[in-house]
Swiss-Prot record:
It catalyses: L-threonyl-[protein] + GDP-beta-L-fucose = 3-O-(alpha-L-fucosyl)-L-threonyl-[protein] + GDP + H(+); L-seryl-[protein] + GDP-beta-L-fucose = 3-O-(alpha-L-fucosyl)-L-seryl-[protein] + GDP + H(+). InterPro entries: Alpha-1_3-FUT_met, Glyco_tran_10_C, Glyco_tran_10_N, Glyco_trans_10, GT10-like_C_sf. PANTHER family: ALPHA- 1,3 -FUCOSYLTRANSFERASE (PTHR11929), ALPHA-(1,3)-FUCOSYLTRANSFERASE 10 (PTHR11929:SF194). Residues 1-8 are cytoplasmic. The gene is FUT10. One of its GO terms (cellular component) is Golgi membrane. SUPFAM superfamilies: UDP-Glycosyltransferase/glycogen phosphorylase. It is found in: Endoplasmic reticulum membrane. It comes from Gallus gallus (Chicken). Its main location: endoplasmic reticulum. This is GDP-fucose protein O-fucosyltransferase 3.
Length: 475
């Protein structure tokens, strides 16, 4: 009996000790959790230090842990930046931008929150169907639009673009320029990894044309297909895409996703010249169509941004279509280079020497705050969000000091694309002529839409699509 009592006593002691240990542990965990959620107050908003919340593959694990502490309750402490276009897909995330913290979300229920300070729009998805109106004095509008006007023409007119306070576009004049969005680094331009010697290219010329064209977005506003069609009358061109198609790619390379495939690069690198024609003619709108041939060691024959000379690695690294009065003259020049190795290689000298002499390009790449396919850097959407966040906080601090807010506004040169023009020789092709009439008509129509949008937004109340179109066609 005594032994049984002793056993019960020992069991009771052990249970009590275990309970006491668990109680203390729970209290410690609770205190740690409370300390994680504390942040110093600045007026009604908080700007204390916060672990970076970056969307990079190398930091996913850290972000998962971080998100446990910074979720929707932050809307009571940090300014809200609401993506009106659901570009990021994030329902709620607190992001660190230097010393500032903002809450980013696509949840439109925050539209009327007193903490909402900015609305972010993606240009391609920008629609008049639903806008965050009425717009309060402290509501900034920010536009992210890296695409050509083909995606949303109305934004490229002064009445529409100047509705925004902050911009990230392909223009060098934008608040966050995305001009080099398709250029990974200066190093890829210098690299000789894909380059094929001219002697081998001469040998390959027995079965290849001197020029290659790869486009599947046909009948673009730039009228590029009309030019290439006329060029084909004067020189041989291998066309692998759906536009003016005359040569097949291997089956596994016919999908658009294969455009960055190493085997696709090998095919293009065999050519001496690549037709690098943009789908629209806009200042600073430069895509992979230029950077790809420069990377591969092929001479680009470029048609696009009128200011392209400002972005080329050297003064003699590309042939500019604008320098020739007719495709016939361009064909004659390319034939001359094709038959003269020394003159041809003059366009590749910069690459062979690794000598990029354009200070504007070097400076732009050095000062760029975002990376392309680089997990060690923020992407341009992160950088855009933080630019707006920092500016929002700048005005919060100015308000606390009793100062007037800083006013930012977009300018017409933040998206500068002139009216589309057809090549004069394209009139011989009826379908192409009617196509250009469509793009020109679209441009003229978009001017009316931009004006109508401005009128309705300045009323500062919601409007219907019927009201919008009545105003458009009233002009």
């Amino acid at each position: 009996m005594v032994r049984m009592r002793r056993k019960r006593l020992w069991a009771s002691c052990i249970c009590f000790a275990a309970f006491f240990f668990l109680l203390v542990t729970l209290q410690v965990i609770t205190e740690l959790g409370n300390s994680e959620n504390k942040a110093p107050a600045v007026s009604s908003l908080h700007s204390g230090p916060l672990k970076p919340d970056e969307r990079h593959a190398s930091q996913l694990k850290k972000n998962e842990l971080y998100s446990n502490f910074r979720t929707e309750p932050d809307t009571d402490h940090y300014p809200i930046l609401l993506w009106w276009s659901p570009l990021t897909g994030e329902t709620g995330r607190s992001g660190q931008c230097g010393e500032d913290v903002c809450f980013f979300t696509i949840n439109k229920t925050y539209q009327h929150s007193q903490m909402t300070r900015a609305f972010l729009f993606y240009g391609t998805d920008f629609s008049i169907d639903s806008l965050p109106l009425p717009r309060k004095d402290h509501h900034d509008w920010a536009l992210f639009h890296e695409e050509s006007p083909k995606n949303n023409y109305k934004l490229f007119h002064e009445p529409a673009i100047t509705l925004f306070n902050h911009t990230a576009t392909f223009s060098r004049h934008s608040h966050l320029p995305l001009t080099t969005q398709y250029l990974e680094s200066i190093e890829v331009l210098r690299s000789l990894r894909h380059m094929i010697p001219v002697q081998m290219k001469n040998s390959l010329r027995k079965r290849l044309a001197p020029l290659v064209y790869v486009q599947s977005d046909c009948n673009a506003p730039s009228d590029r297909d009309s030019y290439v069609r006329e060029l084909m009358c004067h020189i041989e061109v291998d066309s692998y895409g759906e536009c003016l198609h005359n040569r097949d790619l291997p089956q596994h390379l016919r999908n658009p996703s294969a455009m960055d495939d190493g085997n696709f690069y090998k095919i293009l690198a065999q050519y001496k010249f690549i037709l690098a024609f943009e789908n629209a003619i806009c200042e600073d709108y430069i895509t992979e169509k230029l950077w790809r041939p420069l990377m591969l060691g092929v001479v680009p024959v470029y048609f696009g941004s009128p200011s392209i000379i400002d972005w080329l690695p050297s003064n003699k690294s590309a042939i500019l279509v604008s320098s020739f009065s007719h495709p016939r003259e361009l064909a004659r020049y390319i034939k001359t280079l094709d038959q003269n190795d020394q003159e041809y290689e003059a366009y590749l000298e910069w690459k062979l020497k690794g000598d990029i002499s354009n200070p504007r390009l070097l400076t732009a790449m050095k000062e760029r705050k975002w990376g392309v396919q680089d997990v060690t850097q923020d992407n341009y959407i992160d950088t855009f969000e933080c630019m707006v966040c920092n500016r929002v906080w700048e005005n919060i601090r100015r308000e606390e000091k009793g100062w007037l807010p800083q006013r930012w506004s977009a300018q017409v040169n933040h998206l500068n694309c002139p009216k589309p023009e057809a090549f004069w020789f394209s009139s011989s092709n009826p379908s192409q002529s009617s196509l250009q009439e469509m793009w020109i008509a679209s441009f003229e129509q978009s001017k009316k839409e931009a004006w109508a949008l401005r009128q309705l937004v300045e009323r500062n109340r919601n409007f219907t699509t019927q009201e919008f179109w009545m105003l458009v066609f009233k002009q």
